[in-house]
């Protein structure tokens, strides 16, 4: 086999492994963005722990097939970049949805969450959700509220009894 074909097979294997290991993937069309804007997007994604790469559509198509992800073919037209995260489910969608609001040239094509293809609208919806840490803190504040309110009530009753005792 020629070295070029071997290199392409290796790249397909790498992309397939990346798709299998990621908890969420967002596929975008970056056409129309300036180099500075793409650099800014890459920087924001890197800070969020998201890997962002541009691949040829045929490579992604073969890698998706190898990874067992069906339904991506219709979205793999034109320039394609893939943002994947192995840790935070919301991070790629959050960063890209926020960036797309500021830069209309960035078009969300589709996403993959837990092996299922989701629409661009669903990616934007996921992007509007708080992060895992944000959700945990919201849950904790909801759980603490009754205890905190009870403590305030006990304190108020205690202060009221002190005033009446004087």
Curated annotation (Swiss-Prot):
HAMAP family: Ribosomal_uL10 (MF_00362). GO terms for biological process: translation. Part of the ribosomal stalk of the 50S ribosomal subunit. The N-terminus interacts with L11 and the large rRNA to form the base of the stalk. The C-terminus forms an elongated spine to which L12 dimers bind in a sequential fashion forming a multimeric L10(L12)X complex. Belongs to the universal ribosomal protein uL10 family. One of its GO terms (molecular function) is structural constituent of ribosome. Keywords: Ribonucleoprotein, Ribosomal protein, RNA-binding, rRNA-binding. CDD domains: Ribosomal_L10. This is Large ribosomal subunit protein uL10. Forms part of the ribosomal stalk, playing a central role in the interaction of the ribosome with GTP-bound translation factors.
